[in-house]
Design a protein with these regions (language model features):
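N-terminal J-domain/J-like co-chaperone modules of DnaJ/Hsp40 proteins
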Residues: 189-192, 196-271, 275, 296-299
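Short, small-residue-biased leader/transition segments that mark boundaries at the very start
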Residues: 1-2
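Helix-start (N-cap) detector for alpha-helical repeat units in TPR-like alpha-solenoids
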Residues: 10-11, 44-45, 78-79, 90, ...
Length: 308
């Protein structure tokens, strides 16, 4: 079969496109090679370069079609042959990874995502790299390998700063690691990029909620009772603890000890107020802090007043 030679101008464009692909700027590469194909529909190198760039954009359907076209035009083309075999194996590994994740076989998914990255040899700024590491992060999150998942999320965001899945997974990991304030900060960055995104809002609200929850006084510990203690048990514990921490019993002690007694005595009063009220206690057990509980209690009071 006759192999059409690229013009010097087309060859330069294709060379630049390959360089863009190497840097992960696959969108530029696909645009450049498309312009060559439109001018010269028989350009083998353009099809091969465009096919490779499309695969690294996570568009294997179109990418493999272009590589096949390059092979149709030049069946003996070694570069296109190698690229087609490698990208086909990459696509198959990625399909296995995604199917494993759907089946909740998370270890298999993690391994298949790792295999995908090895086969693709994708630049770290390419769309495929960002997508695969973010999906692997999801599998790692399900395996409770939170630090590893966070590392993958960082890679995904470095490749694409607005990669939503990476932000969401990172937020979940940080909350699981007891670092909800960091989760809220990260998600706030994404929220500023797209303030109207409802999913991002929900993830951010959860992180803020968990941050406030982590800062709450631990009222059960303050009272020295279990989370299933009855109201009479709570009141009995309250009286005993008040005897222990009443400021009058610490009047002759150091300023530091007196301040501690005052804080603990105040916390006991707050704990009793919430724990002896069924609605407030339920809200506390659900994770709400003192301010949020007061807001909801007031809203319920107003609603009851209107209903009456």
């Amino acid at each position: 079969m006759y192999k059409r030679q690229a013009t010097p101008c087309a060859a330069a464009t294709i060379g630049a496109a390959r360089a863009e692909t190497f840097l992960g700027r696959c969108d530029r590469a696909t645009r450049a090679t498309l312009s060559v194909i439109r001018e010269d529909p028989g350009n083998v190198s353009a099809y091969a370069a465009r096919g490779h760039a499309l695969c690294l954009s996570d568009d294997f359907d179109q990418g493999l079609k272009h590589l096949k076209e390059a092979l149709r035009l030049d069946p003996d083309g070694a570069d296109a042959q190698r690229a087609f075999r490698r990208m086909k194996k990459t696509a198959d590994a990625l399909t296995r990874a995604r199917e494993s994740f759907k089946r909740r076989a998370f270890e298999e998914a993690r391994d298949a995502f790792t295999e995908t990255l090895a086969l693709a040899d994708a630049p770290e700024r390419s769309p495929l790299f960002a997508e695969v590491v973010s999906e692997r992060a999801q599998a790692l999150l399900r395996l409770r390998l939170h630090e590893e998942a966070l590392a993958d999320c960082d890679l995904a965001v470095a490749a694409r700063e607005d990669h939503k899945r990476a932000y969401y997974v990172a937020g979940s990991c940080l909350i699981a690691l007891g670092r909800p304030a960091e989760a809220a900060e990260r998600l706030e960055v994404l929220l500023k990029m797209d303030p109207s995104d409802e999913t991002t809002k929900k993830h951010h609200e959860k992180a803020v909620f968990e941050t406030r929850k982590a800062k709450r006084p631990r009222y059960y510990e303050v009272l020295g009772v279990s989370s299933v203690a009855s109201v009479p048990e709570i009141k009995q514990a309250y009286k005993a603890r008040c005897m222990e921490w009443h400021p009058d019993r610490h009047a002759t002690k150091s300023d530091e000890e007196k301040a501690l007694a005052e804080r603990n005595f105040k916390a006991l009063g707050e704990a009793l107020e919430i724990m002896e009220d069924p609605m407030k206690r339920k809200l506390y057990d659900e994770g709400y802090d003192k301010e949020a509980i007061a807001e909801r209690a007031e809203a319920a009071r107003r609603a009851a007043h209107r209903g009456g």
